[in-house]
Amino acid sequence: MREEEAAAVVTVPQAGRDGEQPGPPAGLGCAAVRGEPGGGGPQESRKQWKKFLYCEPHKRIKEVLEEELYIKRDECHIKHPPAVALEGIWSIKRNLPVGGLKPGLQSRNSLLPQAKYYSRHGGLRR
């Protein structure tokens, strides 16, 4: 969103009051909305636009909200540390055959993954 769009929020046009006819915001390029000749008729040119300015919350309110966000994030990390959470899902120790081999008996083929076959009748087979 551009800065001009963030500063002014435009609502539906209302019928003109006191003969004022301010133009629509700069971001709208439709001829019918602007009330330009040949683009919507005289009724469109009599409508007035309401503008609302966005005001940020007070600095202290923003700080309190950020503190609450950080507290919730820290509580989540204490309950479920990322390393421990992943350990339950996938583990090198459990999923890969590493270690347990004697250094003198290692061969090239023993380090390769062994073929595993699944059968719906017998389960997992090697």
UniProtKB/Swiss-Prot annotation:
Can you name a GO cellular component term? cytoplasm
Q: Where is this region: Disordered?
A: 1-46
What's the domain of life for this entry?
Answer: Eukaryota
Q: What keywords is this UniProt entry annotated with?
A: Cell projection, Cytoplasm, Cytoskeleton
Q: Indicate whether Thylakoid appears among the record's keywords.
A: no
Q: Where in the cell is it found?
A: Cytoplasm, Cytoskeleton, Cilium basal body
What's the protein here called? Uncharacterized protein C11orf97 homolog
At the highest ranks, the source species' classification is:
Eukaryota, Metazoa, Chordata, Craniata, Vertebrata
